[in-house]
Amino acid sequence: MTNQLEGKIAVVTGGSQGIGRAIAECMVNSGAKVIVGDKNPIESTNLHWHLLDVTNENSVKEFAKQTIDNHGPVNILVNNAGIMTNSPLIEQSVEEWDQVMAVNLRGPFLMAKHLVPLMDISQSPAIINIGSIEGISGNPNHSAYMASKAGVHGLTASMAIDLGPKGIRVNAIAPGWINTELNQGYLDGVPDQEAAQKELVKLHPIGHIGKPSDVGDTAVWLASAQSRFVTGQVIKVEGGRMSQLSLPSIFNKEH
């Protein structure tokens, strides 16, 4: 355990499971007091929870009030709450599209709008938005998700410019394939999971799939003084997946 975030108060949206839960736990282990904002209650002895619907402005306002009243000024905001759909473009409903945009893009906007005025500027606050490598490159049937995450990356740059003069740093993390409950759900639908796992590993030059704590540790760094001159960036946490150009197997040679 390190104390990089000792005395800091952090908010993590969508922190009941997966990457969000890992970020929350990594920050607690680094000395922060962490408030999880989520629709779903959490069972934890070291995390605090308040009800939050990031798509609803009144809910965000109430969450901000509860956080300040019960815990004090926020130093760190992690906009992690997100959803994904898996629909071909022409089959995707407008309602489905709007819901993805509401959670993934409207949510970070509303959280920043109502939490930034309540931040403790003297403590070098930081905002971390969770994007995705799918906001940079393409995958089939994920048009709403990809568009929303590209929007998160753009929002991050704009927020960094707007909030920099206030002393607030803003960065995004773009995770690749991380071993979460959500991604395991995709694997559960594959007949040969062992073969699928091997193929996934091949996509990563580093030789293994990421863990939620890999993203959590990156978030701790971005929230800490060690990254004090880093802002407006999208940090890819993807094991080198986007660094390699895959060629057909006929080009592979054994040495």
Language model features by range: what are they?
Residues 112, 148, 156:
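Active-site helix of classical SDR
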Residues 117, 161-165, 228:
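Alpha-helical segment proximal to the catalytic Tyr-Lys
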Residues 172, 194-226, 230, 237-239:
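C-terminal helical subdomain
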Residues 88-89, 96-101, 200:
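Substrate-binding pocket helix/loop in short-chain dehydrogenase/reductase
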Residues 90, 137-144, 165-166, 207, ...:
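Active-site loop immediately N-terminal to the catalytic Tyr-X3-Lys motif
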Residues 231-255:
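Short C-terminal tail/terminal secondary-structure segment
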Residues 132:
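Residue(s) in the substrate-gating loop at a strand-loop-helix junction
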